Amino acid sequence: MKIVVLQGSPNSKGSTNILVENFIEGAREKEHEVVRFDISKMNIKPCLGCVACGYEGPCVQKDDNEIIKKALLPSDMLVLATPLYYYGMSAQLKIVIDRFCSYNYSLTGKHLKSALLTVAWNQDDWTFEALVSHYKTLVRYLELEDQGMILGYGCGNVSMTTHSKYPQEAYQLGYSL
């Protein structure tokens, strides 16, 4: 299986990255091909809302989003990885998702498998409600097949994350595919 991981944290050595690395390790042990994009290091502009693409055509913006598109369309799975910022996904990840607009119909109906990897400082039971709702809406709209969510409560720094159960859960999710 070909898996595309969109790593949406601007902190390449942070808690989100720990989950991503563990997920990838598990998936590769099962001999899956994994392509990882560290979005914050890429040149991807926000959607202009011009709809010149007609929801299924070339985007007027020429940037690194085309690299993601070329990897994602022939893939079997999409993994969204993000820290929780103000109870939602990072702006970096949201920009990429908004840019799905130009290949909307190609994504919808592919029935890609999907997963969500996320971390937050908070430990309140409601911490991830808005993000999970957004993810589930994307799953429904894009006709994805959710394989699981790793919701890393209380992962405010690398030490907290490393000593939590979540890296192992991310590994297990990757290995279970």
Which residues fall in each region the model found?
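Short active-site-adjacent structural elements
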Residues: D125-W126, N157-S159
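Conserved adenylate-forming
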Residues: Y105
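Short, glycine-/small-residue-rich phosphate/pyrophosphate-handling segment
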Residues: A91-Q92, T108-M149
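N-terminal beta1-alpha1-beta2 submodule of the flavodoxin-like/Rossmannoid cofactor-binding fold
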Residues: M1-A81, Y87-S102, L151, S159, ...
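Short glycine-rich anion-binding loops that position phosphate/pyrophosphate groups of nucleotides
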Residues: L84-Y86, W121-N122
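Short, glycine/serine-rich, charged loops/turns that create anion-binding
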Residues: P10-N11, W121-Q123, G154
